[in-house]
Design a protein with these regions (language model features):
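Short, charged/polar, Gly/Pro-enriched secondary-structure boundary elements
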Residues: 44-45, 119-122
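Glycine- and Gly-Pro-enriched alpha-helical subdomains that act as flexible
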Residues: 111-114, 121
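Contiguous, small/hydrophobic- and glycine-enriched helical/loop subdomains that border
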Residues: 69-110
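Long, positively charged amphipathic alpha-helical accessory segments at protein N-termini or as interdomain linkers
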Residues: 93-106, 123-188
Length: 188
């Protein structure tokens, strides 16, 4: 089942309640405004967010604070199969796509770095008490690194950059995500 939203409050609700998730589901968030997707261990700079009228919502994923910009593709994959490989397959397919487009991308743990230094794609995975695996994928299409520095509370070790700077579009990345998900019965 695939759910889409552009509203961060709806995204948080969907993730918290695992709406419609019986065995497996995909949530695609295409933010309509800048927002922060935080974790319990890595909050956003709430004072700065409030001063700018920006929202921050805690999701149940691992990893750090993600700043989502309009045009970005944020993916949540829920599964009761603890051995699912959605992140791994999606990462490999993204690497192949970027290389096909002539983009020099390297894998650095859970991140893909363009030009060996700019984070354009990141993943995290967490398991809930209910035996549900939540895999999160952040695909940066648009990015303002200075704004990310002001919103995130941890020191930035990898500078983010948007794939639009390399000529890659939201639609191309959405097509890739949906293709991998639709083919997932055969590869996961």
């Amino acid at each position: 089942m695939i759910f889409t939203t552009d509203d961060v409050d709806r995204l948080a609700e969907m993730c918290e309640h695992k709406i419609g998730i019986e065995e497996e589901g995909l949530v695609i968030f295409r933010p309509s405004e800048v927002c922060a997707l935080t974790t319990f261990s890595d909050p956003a700079n709430e004072d700065f967010m409030k001063s700018r009228g920006l929202k921050a919502r805690k999701l149940g994923n691992a990893g750090g604070c993600i700043v989502a910009f309009p045009g970005n593709v944020e993916v949540g994959h829920f599964s009761k199969d603890l051995d699912n490989h959605f992140i791994e397959v999606m990462t490999e397919e993204a690497l192949a796509f970027f290389k096909m487009r002539g983009l020099d991308v390297v894998r650095d743990n859970n991140d893909l770095l363009a030009d060996g230094q700019h984070k354009v794609f990141s993943t995290s995975r967490a398991t809930y008490n209910e035996g549900i695996v939540f895999s999160a994928i952040h695909i940066s299409i648009n990015c303002d690194a200075d704004l990310v520095r002001k919103i995130c509370t941890k020191e930035m070790k990898k500078v983010p950059k948007g794939l639009s700077d390399y000529g890659i579009t939201t639609e191309e990345m959405l097509d890739l995500v949906l293709r991998v998900y639709e083919e997932s019965d055969n590869v996961l």
